[in-house]
Amino acid sequence: MTPDWHSSLILTAYILIFLTGLPANLLALRAFMGRVRQPQPAPVHILLLNLTLADLLLLLLLPFRIVEAASNFRWYLPKIVCALTGFGFYSSIYCSTWLLAGISMERYLGVAFPVQYKLSRRPLYGVIAALVAWIMSFGHCTIVIIVQYLNSTEQVGTENQITCYENFTQEQLDVVLPVRLELCLVLFFVPMAVTIFCYWRFVWIMLTQPHVGAQRRRRAVGLAVVTLLNFLVCFGPYNMSHLVGFYLRQSPSWRVEAVVFSSLNASLDPLLFYFSSSVVRRAFGKGLLLIRNPASSMLGRGAKETVEGTKMDRGGSQAEGVQSSEFVTE
């Protein structure tokens, strides 16, 4: 079936997100894996690694969305595939919101209480925070599977064609709409409020300390702006559809487009990684060099680069003499 213009537009968006997000997140994964393997990694390393994994989960499931869009949003795969891909797709989105909130809290605590934070931070805290984010997202998104067994793939038209998690009966809506509202409140508005407060304080501290370098100030502002864009542009439309749907007692017609914006998160997060970590900045730089010169190879140099990156970050912090500006991943 040839996709119409609407499906073609969404199909193009999904393909672009996949092509830009996958290589960038794979580079970030390689960089963060090197950091986490080091003794006593900071909690933020673990959170950033898990955010990368959440993005990769979404990107690996994106081909199913691409096939769906190419088929004019008719679902020709088995019903269980609809349930499992939807579960993983939406779980990755909502896991990202609390991971972003956790990263913002770590940044704020690092600059507001630098001495206490440095003395008390433990890798275990990052592991616990990441586990909580995954458990909350997986637990809430089981609604996708529950609704599947309420026959969430509904026949449309007269050709025995079905859609995936799109057309609902009244029985399904009675289950879906209240849960979507709770998802919106607990997994979007609460972490967004935490993130806005933490980055507001974080940026204010960074900009008002005279001994913080201009480059670090720019990275602090960039980090806050990218994170805020993530919430407002990527997650905002999709979660607003939950509020509108609950009020109207039916799914709004623009939910499909809102899901596309949520997927854009996987392409926007690498910018956050870039502002967060000097290791990622070097990895992206080496990736560009590799594209320009395919004969060169980065294999086998990860551990050496990670050690060098650690020394460079620490040296830079000492040179600036700013205890409270350790927002750059060490």
UniProtKB/Swiss-Prot annotation:
UniProt cross-references to InterPro entries, sorted A to Z: GPCR_Rhodpsn (IPR000276), GPCR_Rhodpsn_7TM (IPR017452), GPR40-rel_orph (IPR013312)
Distribution of this protein across tissues and organs: Highly expressed in hematopoietic tissues, such as spleen and bone marrow, with highest levels in a subset of immune cells, including monocytes or neutrophils. Expressed in adipose tissues with high expression in differentiating adipocytes. Expressed by intestinal endocrine cells.
Induction: During differentiation of leukocytes. This induction is STAT3-dependent. Up-regulated in adipose tissues by high-fat diet.
Disruption-associated phenotype: Knockout mice display altered protective intestinal inflammatory and immune responses but no gross developmental defects.
Key words, A-Z: Cell membrane, G-protein coupled receptor, Glycoprotein, Immunity, Inflammatory response, Lipid-binding, Membrane, Receptor, Transducer, Transmembrane, Transmembrane helix
Compositional bias per record (Polar residues), positions renumbered to this chain: 320-330
Residue numbers on the Cytoplasmic membrane side: 30-43, 101-126, 206-219, 277-330
Protein name, UniProt field: Free fatty acid receptor 2
Naturally occurring in which organism (per UniProt): Mus musculus (Mouse)
